Amino acid sequence: MSALAVEPEPARGDGWDELVRIWEETDAPEGCKVEIIEGIVTVAPPPANQHNSIAAKVHRVLIREIPEEWNVYQTLGLALPDRAGMYMPDLVVAPEAVVDEEPGNFVPAAVAELVVEITSKWNANHDRIVKLQAYATAAVPLYLLVDRWHSGRPTATLYGEPQNGLYRVLDAVEFGRDLHLPAPFDLTIDTSTFPLG
């Protein structure tokens, strides 16, 4: 992964606006993901085929079960100015009307009902630590971390009930077992279909 270093500034005011401007104007190769992580604009290469396959499988389950007024987004930017972050999660479930009404290329992270991140080998700690804390701080109700690189044992962990910037683990399974998402989703994801490696 390559990163374009940007001098960290306060998360609010001109510093945040400048970071967003750089993020919006970064001309990355097609398929690459541009994010702001802890005040640094980063460019990550396209995800691996297995990563995309997992995203497609989770997307398929979610789209069948979510309320009609919600949608599943694959390239929706989530703004977290208090954490100097602009993330592009693998999947976001959010109310369609809110996304449709928000101008620009991103929405406040707090509008998300569920965020799904699938780790890549070279930046897994962003998803495990930085984004976990940021989504909890933004009070995103559910965060599903699909960690293909977890200590040699791929896992899926569902975090929820955010309070004071911290999540509680609601469920954690190794690939091969079912993971249940509580209401308002009330659905099960079969991780045995997730490719390994």
Located regions from the model:
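Gly/Pro/Ser/Thr-rich low-complexity, intrinsically disordered segments predominantly at protein N-termini
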Residues: M1-A138, L142-G197
